[in-house]
Amino acid sequence: MLTATLTGDGETYMASLKSGLEETPNSPLLNWFSSGGDYNNYKKFSTDFPEHASAAYNMVAYGYANGEIGGKVDYEAAMKALDKSRELHDGPNALDSRAEIYAMSGDYLKARQNQFGAYDYASFASPYQPKLVTYWRKENKDEIVKNLKEAQVNLQNAILERNEEEYLKYVTEDMQLVAGDSNLQEFYEFTNESLNRQNDVNWNSFDLRDINVDFSPDMTMAILTFYADGSYTQGDSEDVVDYSTRASAVWIATDNGWKSVHANWAPYGGGSGIPKN
């Protein structure tokens, strides 16, 4: 059976498991191996082998949380199952599961508290650390949204004013900002040289509005969508061009805060973008 497991020989593995159960039907280990794939099987295992059921209770908790056991979501039953899991083995995995199930229920404060408990077992190179950060960000999502909206406005103002010191607060050396301008020319890497390049656009006004923020599930990336209105003249001309665009931007979470890595602009609502180079 071990050889079949190591070599990935599924047919031999299942035959060995069947033979083993026929010879030793009360083996907790062999019954555990045969329980996979169905939450109700894990529940049966926890009843048949209660002294060896820490891992089974952990899986049963997910069965309740997903509504796979009992036909409806039952977070209270899930937590009771995890309590039983911890009574048999007081390790980090059950705390990690409690955190994940609290997150499923939308309680990110309790999720983070339990994730801290799991993290305390092994803080060095801990596999529990990333979710700890995720739960903190979910718990503080409103504040992060507010800060990202402000950052997008500040970044755009820094670009318009060619304020390199301010601009550098919102980008990272680890990943170049890639932009697509509203003149619909090719995408390009927006560098310090791009920031300081002179052009003949004279802005009368430029305002962002209706900024919306969405996050990736792990809260490491944010997608901002928004609109921009304003007007400008070009060169010595006094003709005013009405500027109207829709845009999106990608921000990533780094060790130094949220940084912009992509922006895409396009004319919107009958207005114009910036002139072609």
Report the location of each language-model feature:
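Glycine-centered coil turns and helix-coil junctions that link the paired helices
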Residues: L2-D9, N26-S27, S34, D38, ...
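TPR/TPR-like (Sel1-like) alpha-helical repeat modules
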Residues: K18-E22, A103, Y108-F124
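Boundary/linker segments of alpha-helical solenoid repeat arrays
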Residues: P25-W32, A53-A56, G91-L95, D120-V133
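Short, low-complexity N-terminal intrinsically disordered segments enriched in polar/charged residues
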Residues: V133-E173, L177, I274-N277
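A solvent-exposed, acidic/Ser-Thr-rich amphipathic alpha-helical stretch
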Residues: E164-P217, Y227, V241-Y243
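Short beta-strand edge/turn micro-motifs at domain boundaries
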Residues: S244-I274
